[in-house]
C-alpha cells in the first residue's frame, strides 16, 4: 500500500479511511440483496451465478491493481466488473425489487472507482 500512497491521484480521490468504510457498507448491502434473491422462491440460479462471478472479478481487481500495479489492465477488468454488476442488479431487480435497489450503491461506487482507476492508469 506504500506505493499506492505515492501515486498521483485524481482531484476527487477520497481519504484512505473512506475505502474500508464504503466497502463494509457495500458488502453488507450486497449480502442482504443476495439473501433476498436466495429466499425469494423464484428461479434465481442465473442471478446468483452472475453474482458469484462478479464477486470473483471484484476479488481479482484488487490483486491486479494493488499487488501487480497493472493499472490499465485493472481498469479494463473493472469495466467488465461494472457490466457484471449491472447485469446482476437487473437480474436481482426482476426477482426482488429491493435486492435490485440494494445493488445500486455498489454500482455507483464501482463507477467512481473506475474514475479513480483510469486517472491512476493515465497519470502514473
Residue ranges and their predicted role:
Residues 1-21:
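Interfacial loop at the N-terminal end of multi-pass membrane proteins
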Residues 14-28, 69-81:
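Membrane-interface loop-to-helix entry segments
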Residues 23-34, 54-57:
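Core segments of transmembrane alpha-helices
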Residues 34-42, 89-94:
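Structural signal for the C-terminal ends of transmembrane alpha-helices
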Residues 43-51:
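Membrane-interfacial loop-to-transmembrane alpha-helix junctions, especially the N-terminal start
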Residues 51-59, 75-88, 106-110:
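Hydrophobic alpha-helical segments of small multi-pass membrane proteins
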Residues 65-71, 87-100:
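Membrane-helix boundary connector in multi-pass membrane proteins
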Residues 114-124:
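Juxtamembrane boundary at the C-terminal end of a transmembrane helix
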Amino acid at each position: 500500500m506504500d506505493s499506492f500512497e505515492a501515486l498521483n491521484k485524481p482531484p476527487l480521490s477520497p481519504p484512505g479511511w473512506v475505502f474500508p468504510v464504503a466497502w463494509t457498507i457495500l458488502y453488507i448491502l450486497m449480502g442482504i440483496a443476495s439473501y433476498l434473491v436466495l429466499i425469494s422462491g423464484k428461479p434465481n440460479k442465473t442471478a446468483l451465478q452472475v453474482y458469484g462471478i462478479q464477486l470473483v472479478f471484484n476479488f481479482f481487481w484488487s490483486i491486479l491493481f494493488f499487488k501487480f500495479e497493472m493499472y490499465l489492465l485493472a481498469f479494463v477488468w473493472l469495466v467488465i466488473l461494472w457490466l457484471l454488476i449491472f447485469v446482476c442488479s437487473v437480474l436481482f431487480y426482476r426477482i426482488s425489487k429491493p435486492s435490485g435497489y440494494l445493488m445500486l450503491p455498489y454500482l455507483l461506487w464501482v463507477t467512481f472507482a473506475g474514475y479513480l482507476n483510469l486517472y491512476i492508469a493515465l497519470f502514473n
